[in-house]
């Protein structure tokens, strides 16, 4: 992990394994191809962007495929950037933004200790 601070806050730079990207893409495809899942997972009303498809990823999926990877890397980020140990870790939300021509995300703030 590389740590950079180009404009103030520290930014951790990591490479997400293709296996994890593939899992996320497959999950999004499953949701997109199931109207009831798509309606249940529609996150667009909760977000600030002018984007038609923002899809919430389920807690089950997060726990099964993402939590370990995220925790390991957040732990490294906290240690390298603040020289502190991570005490607690919880993914509050996880969503995928499918952004198309003329859609945009304005400047906005994410609550919580870390976002990305």
Region annotations inferred by a language model:
Residues 83-94:
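A short coil-to-beta-strand element that immediately follows conserved catalytic motifs
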Residues 6, 88, 108-112:
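A generic structural micro-feature
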Residues 1-83, 104:
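Non-heme Fe(II)/2-oxoglutarate
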Residues 93-116:
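Catalytic core of non-heme Fe(II) oxygenases with the double-stranded beta-helix
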């Amino acid at each position: 992990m590389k740590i950079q601070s180009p404009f103030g806050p520290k930014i951790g730079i990591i490479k997400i394994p293709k296996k994890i990207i593939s899992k996320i893409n497959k999950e999004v495809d499953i949701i997109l191809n199931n109207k009831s899942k798509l309606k249940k997972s529609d996150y667009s009303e909760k977000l600030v962007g002018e984007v038609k498809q923002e899809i919430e990823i389920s807690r089950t999926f997060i726990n099964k495929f993402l939590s370990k990877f995220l925790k390991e890397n957040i732990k490294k980020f906290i240690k390298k950037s603040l020289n502190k140990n991570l005490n607690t870790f919880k993914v509050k939300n996880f969503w995928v933004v499918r952004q198309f021509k003329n859609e945009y995300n304005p400047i906005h703030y994410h609550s919580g200790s870390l976002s990305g």
